[in-house]
Amino acid sequence: AKEQGLGQLDRESVGRFEDAHIHLCGNGVQFRSGRQVSAQAGDGADAEAGGAAGGGGGATAAGSEPQARDDVPALSPREHDVPRALETEELAQVRDEYVASARLAIESGLDGVELHAANGYLLHQFLAPNANVREDGYGGSAQARTRFVVEVAQAVADAIGADRVGIRISPAHPFNGVEETDAEETRATYEALVDQLAPIGLAYLSVLAFDEERMSLAQDLAARFGGPILLNGGFSSVTTFADVEALLAEGVADAVVVGRAFLANPDLVERWQAAGDDAGLNEPDQETFYGGGAEGYTDYPTRVA
């Protein structure tokens, strides 16, 4: 769920920032077959703009400018305007747009919202030292760089209930121009973040952890968070059933997040339950990810019993 027209990944990605958008996920909610369904709330165009633009990217609203934590040019191969840094007094408006989008998601019939503070999106930019060079109270120290993320999480939790809100983070994962290369600084940042998130009582913390160093940090964050932990193995390969079992065996995660395999296999759980990695899976078509029409969205076949 994109919180404003400025924050869409591109012109085809789903946005939900006005009452008229409540119907957007209605059909998907109707066909969820008893499962819980959540929307991911994040300023997506910032990631498309290479970790720079906080709300502009490929689709800017008429009369508005792309926004970011700082005025760094976009690295995306697509053509983008150079974003401008958000003024301190504008941050409350951006926070409130996350809240509005979350409310609309719940009114649409969804069960929850995941705040996207990973992969170079706007909230991740505030956390990363190379992206956040602000000189106000939202930049500088590790504690200050977590401030906006915590404010957004608290506001969304207050609006729709903390038990309906999760948050996704990707510590030390260089992506879309955001880098966290200093291990000590990264640990300090995410420990400060999770220490402030824990009292809010969020539904879960989702952490990208795909090697020994990141798993060690995930273990530390899990202990600090004190609630359900989701793990994800990253982008290097499509997650297999064996990968899921290995992540669970680490004893950190309550569940494992699966992306591409699930996109291509709407009945992935049933396939894995029946045959594990011996189950034949549809191959995901990356060209149809993140938007567009029915192709790659509703046309993957399910397993014939």
Language-model-detected regions and their locations in the chain:
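Flavin-dependent oxidoreductase catalytic cores
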Residues: A1, R11, R16, H23-A305
